[in-house]
Regions:
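C-terminal binding/interaction regions
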Residues: 162
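Channel- or pocket-lining gating/hinge segments that regulate access to a cavity or pore
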Residues: 168-170
Length: 218
């Protein structure tokens, strides 16, 4: 798998640190509720956005998400899917196998997955709101891809950066990635120092004082 310098740096961080950097910059991006649906590894990559919606007609349609998987030509993609319906799956093991074959790094679903053992068995990471067994067929369709979407309250654009780990999922606007990473690295370094200070016996009240966090900006 090829890894450019930006993704390498992002992979060296965690969602907590990236979320903190976005907070300092006054930017949205951190989400709540999009967690690993099996004990999968952290993923970092670029967003391929997919909008789903209810199926209203009776005519057969191309299966949701499959056209996006077929179009992938690089190995930095994470599928970012929104428009799911409570209790209805918008991901399953056949899609996971197809995505794995295309070198896609994982899926983040503002919705539910089924067949999670199938994704786990091929080490395909899936992050989302929960699990179900109910099929999307004749219930959900793909209505758009490659367009801005809203995921857990955050607007995500095609090619934005994604990091997801056990604490959840964070999106970073592509135009801000360099600034966010630079600040996140400073935060990580400062927080490592704060942990060491506590372990060395310094007062946690002093170590965690707001003024210490404000100093990270400088």
């Amino acid at each position: 798998m090829l890894q450019d310098a930006t993704l390498t740096t992002l992979a060296s961080l965690d969602t907590n640190t990236v979320s903190d950097a976005l907070d300092f910059m006054g930017l949205p991006g951190a989400t709540f509720g999009l967690r690993p649906l099996w004990n999968c590894p952290k993923i970092v990559g670029r967003a391929s956005t997919i909008q789903l919606g209810p199926k209203t007609g009776t005519a057969p349609t191309v299966h949701l998400i499959s056209p996006v998987i077929a179009s992938v030509t690089t190995d930095d993609r994470i599928l970012v899917i929104t428009g799911g319906t409570e209790g209805i799956s918008c991901w399953g093991d056949i899609l996971a196998n197809a995505a794995k074959m295309k070198g896609i790094r994982g899926s983040v679903i503002d919705g539910m997955s089924r067949d999670i053992e199938g994704s786990e068995s091929i080490d395909y990471p899936v992050y989302g709101r929960g699990l179900t067994m109910i099929s999307a067929r004749n219930r959900l369709i793909q209505v758009a891809s490659g367009t801005p979407i809203v995921v857990a309250g955050v607007t995500v654009c095609e090619d934005d950066y994604v990091i997801a780990d056990r604490c959840g999922t964070v999106f970073v606007p592509a135009a801000k990635i360099a600034e966010v990473l630079a600040l996140a690295q400073r935060i990580a370094s400062r927080q490592d120092g704060m942990v060491q200070a506590v372990r060395a016996g310094q007062s946690v009240e002093d170590v965690m004082h707001d003024k210490k966090f404000e100093a990270i900006k400088g």
